Curated annotation (Swiss-Prot):
Keyword Membrane: yes
Gene field: OR1E1
Keyword Lyase: no
Protein name: Olfactory receptor 1E1
Superkingdom, taxonomy of origin: Eukaryota
Any GO molecular function: olfactory receptor activity
Length: 314
């Protein structure tokens, strides 16, 4: 009987966003514009880092991977949301739902790991400037990026395989705009204790520990600055770390608030809004944060534009 129940669910229904029918077209245009902005902004950062030799440094290696992660993170959920809003068809096949969940976890976890790597890079740059090149060697940086990809791949695969073993009965309505893992667990009609324990344990490893490592890095940075207080040193630290701190606050603020600090009167609307912030808004804002507050990125853009003008004027 349980096997029949599992195979009877061939697809799920995504309720999407709690918007009125008359607001559908406006919201569709808004999310399409946000998605295109995310794609173009992050692609611009990747291309600039690739083309400008001045940006071939550890910090920008991590940033290019972060931009790629943001680009993919949005692409996991937003195209399906736009399709459902346009076609008025909220269904998603069972296999597609698990696939979406897998890539959502992969790129979300990858962002967490890369933010830690960038925090460590800033820590070394400010606290050990004379040894920066020796510590942040190309081999170390490539190893960190490769390890981040491997760990997040296995973590996402673990949760996906555990989800695939569950049985789903008659209820196939997901009160979300994507296949959220916690929402899927609520629909399962088999024992989910193993899944919940793995989420609890791995959540600490993937979210809490990286966040604490970032806090530790910035605590050491602040301590280093206070030892030799000067307006020049403070300005340098702010210019070096300001963009990264903004991104960390956006990402971890919403994720921790949603998954690790749920309120007693938690509602579907609140969960949807907070999920929208870190899946749509944060990836869109990251390119603006890093380009508008970063002299290196502005300089790289100017040099690339100047080179193109020179090329076409020949």
């Amino acid at each position: 009987m349980m096997g029949q129940n599992q195979t009877s669910i061939s697809d799920f229904l995504l309720l999407g966003l709690p918007i009125q029918p008359e607001q559908q077209n406006l919201c569709y245009a808004l999310f399409l514009a946000m998605y295109l902005t995310t794609l173009l902004g992050n692609l611009l950062i990747i291309v600039l880092i690739r083309l400008d030799s001045h940006l071939h440094t550890p910090m920008y290696l991590f940033l290019s991977n972060l931009s790629f992660s943001d680009l993919c993170f949005s692409s996991v959920t937003i195209p399906k949301l736009l399709q459902n809003m346009q076609n008025q068809d909220p269904s998603i096949p069972y296999a597609d739902c698990l696939t979406q969940m897998y890539f959502f976890l992969l790129f979300g976890d990858l962002e967490s790991f890369l933010l830690v790597a960038m925090a460590y890079d800033r820590y070394v740059a400010i606290c050990f400037p004379l040894h920066y090149t020796a510590i942040m060697s190309p081999m170390l940086c490539l190893s960190v990026v490769a390890l981040s990809w491997v760990l997040t791949t296995f973590h996402a695969m673990l949760h996906t395989l555990l989800m695939a073993r569950l049985c789903f009965c008659a209820d196939n309505v997901i009160p979300h705009f994507f296949c959220d893992m916690s929402a899927l667990l609520k629909l399962a009609c088999s024992d989910t204790r193993v899944n919940e324990w793995v989420i609890f344990i791995m959540g600490g490893l993937i979210l809490v520990i990286p966040f604490l490592l970032i806090l530790g890095s910035y605590a050491r940075i602040v301590s280093s600055i206070l030892k030799v207080p000067s307006s020049k040193g403070i300005c340098k630290a702010l210019s070096t770390c300001g963009s990264h701190l903004s991104v960390v606050s956006l990402f971890y603020g919403t994720v921790i608030g949603l998954y690790l600090c749920p309120s007693a009167n938690s509602s579907t609307l609140k969960d949807t809004v907070m999920a929208m912030i870190y899946t749509v808004v944060t990836p869109m804002l990251n390119p603006f944060i890093y380009s508008l507050r970063n002299r290196d990125m502005k300089g790289a853009l100017s040099r690339v534009i100047h080179q193109k003008k020179t090329f076409f004027s020949l």
